[in-house]
From Swiss-Prot:
UniProt binding sites for alpha-maltose 1-phosphate: 255, 315, 350, 386, 525-526
HAMAP family: GlgE (MF_02124)
Reactions performed catalytically: alpha-maltose 1-phosphate + [(1->4)-alpha-D-glucosyl](n) = [(1->4)-alpha-D-glucosyl](n+2) + phosphate
Sites marked Transition state stabilizer: 471
Protein name listed in UniProt: Alpha-1,4-glucan:maltose-1-phosphate maltosyltransferase 2
Protein source organism: Streptomyces coelicolor (strain ATCC BAA-471 / A3(2) / M145)
Gene Ontology biological-process entries: alpha-glucan biosynthetic process; oligosaccharide catabolic process
Annotated Gene3D superfamilies: Glycosidases, Golgi alpha-mannosidase II, Immunoglobulins, Phosphotransferase system, lactose/cellobiose-type IIA subunit
Ranges in coiled-coil conformation: none
EC number(s) stated in the UniProt entry for this protein: 2.4.99.16
Length: 669
C-alpha cells in the first residue's frame, strides 16, 4: 500500500471536509462521548470504485481505529461517517480516500462472468486481488477466508458461477470490511477538534440573587441564608446555580427602584455596578458575608450536586479601586470626566466601561488573576456579561490562558448581538452562548433558528436557552400567562441541551415595567425581591412541578443531551410544532402548542426514518408528562389545550417496551 502525500489536489481527491471552522484554523468542538458526523466529497477519474474512512487522533497523538465512510446518496460523491471522541483534549481528524480495486473487480465480475465475457481471465484477476488483500489481514482475523476464496476463483474444476460465488460470501465480505485492500491512499489535511467536558454542552441552569434570600427580620440575604435555597433548586433537577455579581456595589450615581436615577438610602444598587472602597472584582459585598461564607455556599451547592456559575462583568462603578489606580483603563472625555456606559437606548450612569487599548497586557493579566481567584474558591463556570462590547482578541487571550491550564473551566457568552460577533466569540473560545431563543416564538421562527443552530453552527457554538433573564421579559410571557411559561419551558428544555430559568419564572412573574417594555416592574436588578415559595407550592401557583419533570426527563433520555440530532416533523397547523431527537435506541418526540390562548389541533406527519423506524411502522409512544401511552404511525392527530398540557413529550418505544397502549392519536391533554 502506498500513501500519497497531499500535495495539490491529491491522487484521490478529498474535498470539503466537514465540520471545519474558519478553514481549519480553529477547532471544531465536541464533548466527551458526543457522536458527530464527518463528511467529505470523494471521487476519482473514470469508473473505478473509491472508498473512504475517518481517522481520529487523540490528544496523545495516537490514531484510533479508522471508521469507514458511506456514500450519503448514490452518485453524490458525498461521503460521511459518525465518530465519537473520548477524553477531553485537543484531537484531530482526517479523511482518507482510496481506490477500491476489490469493489471495482466485483462490479465487473458480476457483469462479465454470467455473460461469459473473459470469465477465466476475470476470475484470475480476482484471485490475485484476494491474495493481495489476504497479505494485509492478520492470520487470526480471516486471512484463511480470503485465501480460500482466491483458491476457489482459480479452481477450473468448478463452474465459473460457483467460483465467483465463493468470492462473494458474507464471510468474505466481513473480512474485507475489516481489512479492505486500499490503493492510492490519499489523506486530507488533519483538522483540529477540541473535546470538552459534558457540562459544556448539557445542563440545566438556575439563576437567582442571593441578596433576595433573606429572612423577615433581615431582608438582605447572605450566602448562609441563600444556601437554604439550594436543596429546592437541586430538587427541581438543576445542575448549575448562576449568581449575578457578588461584589461590592458603588454608591455614585446608584440606581433606585425601577431604574430611577435618584436612589434612597435603602436602595441596594445594581450588582453590575461593581466596586466600592470595600473592594472590586475579587471582593465580596459585605452584606452577603465573607469569603468563608462564599466557600460554605459553594460546598453546600456541591453537596447537592450543583455547580456554581459566577457572573463576570468587566466594568466598574465610579467607586471601583481601578478608577484611581488605573486611570488608563477608562475613556476620559476632554473635560477629564469618564463617560458612563451605554447600550442604546439603555444608559448606565452608575457604570464605567473599560478602555482596552491603552494597556491590554495589564488588563489581561488582571482579568486572569481575578478569574483564577474565584477558580481557587470552587468556581469552574463563568457567565461573561456583554463580551461583545470588548475586543474579541482580548477574550481569545484570556480564555486561552485559563483553559490552557484548566480545560474544564466553562465560559458562557451573554451576547445578544449581531450573528457575526456571536459566532466569532464561540469560535475563539467561549464554550456556550446566549441566543435569540427569547425572540423566536412562531413555528417558522423556531424551525429556521434551530436548524441553523443544530446544523453547521453546532461545530463551534453551543446554545444556552434561558427562558427569561432579569433583563428580558418577552411580550409572549407578558400576555400568555401560565400556559406561555409552560410551553416555553418545554421548548427550552427539549430543543437545547442546555437551558435555564431566572428565579421567579416558576411563579410566572410577568408584569412589565410599562406596556411595550421587556423590563420587569420592580426588577430584582434594583431591589430585593423575596418570594414565598412555600405559599406558591401550597396554592398551586408555581410551575415548579413541570420544571422538575422536564429536568427529570432530560436526565433519563440521552437524546436530549445533544444538539446535532434535532429533526423537525410536519404539522398541518402552524400553531403546533413537532420535533424529535435520537441517540441510539433512545428517541424523544415533542409536540407543542405555541398558542397559549387557544386549543389547537393538527395532524402530525412523522419522518419515520428520522425516528429509526420504517415508514409503515406503528409504535407505542409514552407521554413522559402525563404517563399516557398511544400507538402512533406515520400520521397522527393531536389536540392540545392550554392550561391542561402545553405539549406531549413522547418516549418512542419499541413495541415490546409498553403495555396496553391506547389506540389512535392523542385526545385533549
Amino acid at each position: 500500500m502506498r500513501m500519497s502525500a497531499t500535495v495539490g489536489i491529491g491522487r484521490i481527491p478529498v474535498r470539503d471536509v466537514q465540520p471545519v471552522v474558519e478553514y481549519g484554523r480553529r477547532p471544531a468542538k465536541a464533548v466527551t462521548g458526543e457522536t458527530f458526523e464527518v463528511t467529505a466529497t470523494v471521487f476519482r477519474e473514470g469508473h473505478d470504485a473509491v472508498a473512504a474512512n475517518v481517522v481520529l487522533k487523540d490528544p496523545e497523538g495516537r490514531p484510533g481505529p479508522w471508521t469507514p465512510m458511506r456514500e450519503l446518496a448514490p452518485g453524490s460523491d458525498r461521503w460521511g461517517a459518525t465518530v465519537t471522541p473520548g477524553a477531553p483534549g485537543n484531537w484531530t481528524y482526517r479523511v482518507e480516500a482510496w481506490s477500491d480495486p476489490v469493489a471495482t473487480w466485483r462490479h465487473a465480475a458480476r457483469i462479465k462472468v454470467p455473460a461469459g465475457i473473459d470469465a477465466g481471465l476475470v476470475l484470475e484477476e480476482g484471485s490475485e486481488l484476494y491474495r493481495r488483500a489476504a497479505a494485509g489481514v492478520p492470520k487470526d482475523s480471516g486471512r484463511d477466508v480470503l485465501l480460500a476464496a482466491a483458491t476457489a476463483l482459480l479452481d477450473d474444476t468448478l463452474p465459473v458461477a460457483t467460483r465467483l460465488a465463493a468470492a462473494l460470501t458474507p464471510q468474505v465480505d466481513a473480512v474485507l470490511a475489516r481489512h479492505p485492500l486500499r490503493d492510492l491512499v490519499t489523506s486530507s489535511d488533519p483538522l483540529p477538534l477540541l473535546v470538552e467536558r459534558e457540562r459544556a454542552l448539557y445542563g440545566a441552569w438556575y439563576e437567582f440573587f442571593p441578596r433576595s434570600e433573606g429572612t423577615p427580620h433581615t431582608p438582605h440575604g447572605t450566602f448562609r441564608t441563600a444556601a437554604r435555597r439550594l436543596p429546592a433548586i437541586a430538587a427541581m433537577g438543576f445542575d448549575v446555580v448562576y449568581l449575578p455579581p457578588i461584589h461590592p456595589i458603588g454608591t455614585t450615581h446608584r440606581k433606585g427602584r425601577n431604574n430611577t436615577l435618584s436612589a434612597t438610602g435603602d436602595d441596594v444598587g445594581v450588582p453590575w455596578a461593581i466596586g466600592s472602597p470595600e473592594g472590586g472584582h475579587d471582593s465580596i459585598h459585605p452584606a452577603l458575608g465573607t469569603l468563608d461564607d462564599f466557600d460554605h455556599f459553594v460546598t453546600e451547592a456541591a453537596r447537592h450536586g450543583l455547580e456554581i456559575a459566577l457572573d463576570f462583568a468587566l466594568q466598574c462603578s465610579p467607586d471601583h479601586p481601578w478608577v484611581h489606580k488605573h486611570p488608563e483603563w477608562f475613556h476620559h472625555r476632554p473635560d477629564g470626566t469618564i463617560a458612563h456606559a451605554e447600550n442604546p437606548p439603555k444608559k448606565y450612569q452608575d457604570i464605567y466601561p473599560i478602555a482596552f487599548d491603552a494597556d491590554p497586557d495589564g488588563l489581561a493579566t488582571e482579568t486572569v488573576r481575578i478569574l483564577r481567584h474565584w477558580m481557587d474558591h470552587g468556581v469552574r463556570i463563568f457567565r461573561v456579561d456583554n463580551p461583545h462590547t470588548k475586543p474579541v482578541a482580548f477574550w481569545e487571550r484570556v480564555i486561552a490562558d485559563i483553559n490552557g491550564t484548566d480545560p474544564d473551566v466553562i465560559f458562557l457568552a451573554e451576547a445578544f448581538t449581531r450573528p457575526a460577533m456571536m459566532a466569532t466569540l464561540a469560535q475563539i473560545g467561549f464554550q456556550q452562548s446566549y441566543t435569540y431563543f427569547t425572540w423566536r416564538n412562531t413555528k417558522q421562527e423556531l424551525t429556521e433558528y434551530l436548524e441553523e443552530l443544530s446544523g453547521e453552527a453546532a461545530a463551534y457554538m453551543r446554545p444556552n436557552f434561558f427562558a427569561n433573564t432579569p433583563d428580558i421579559l418577552h411580550a409572549y410571557l407578558q400576555h400568555g400567562g401560565r400556559p406561555a411559561f409552560e410551553v416555553r419551558a418545554v421548548l427550552a428544555a427539549t430543543l437545547s441541551p442546555t437551558w435555564g430559568i431566572y428565579s421567579g419564572y416558576e411563579l410566572c412573574e410577568n408584569t412589565p415595567l410599562r406596556e411595550g417594555s421587556e423590563e420587569y416592574l420592580d426588577s430584582e436588578k434594583y431591589q430585593l425581591k423575596p418570594r414565598d415559595w412555600t405559599r406558591a407550592a401550597r396554592e398551586g401557583t408555581t410551575i415548579a412541578p413541570l420544571v422538575t419533570r422536564l429536568n427529570t426527563i432530560r436526565r433519563e433520555h440521552p437524546a436530549l443531551h445533544r444538539l446535532r440530532n434535532l429533526r423537525f416533523h410536519h404539522t398541518d397547523n402552524d400553531a403546533l410544532i413537532a420535533y424529535s431527537k435520537r441517540v441510539g435506541s433512545d428517541v424523544v418526540l415533542v409536540v407543542a402548542n405555541l398558542d397559549p390562548h387557544r386549543t389547537q389541533e393538527a395532524t402530525i406527519s412523522l419522518d419515520m426514518p428520522q425516528l429509526g423506524l420504517d415508514w409503515h411502522d406503528s409504535v407505542p409512544v409514552h407521554d413522559e408528562l402525563t404517563g399516557r401511552t398511544y400507538h402512533w404511525g406515520r400520521a397522527n392527530y393531536v389536540r392540545l389545550e392550554p392550561g391542561r398540557a402545553p405539549a406531549h413529550v413522547f418516549h418512542v418505544r419499541r413495541p415490546s417496551a409498553a403495555a396496553a397502549p391506547q389506540n389512535g392519536g392523542s385526545g385533549a391533554s
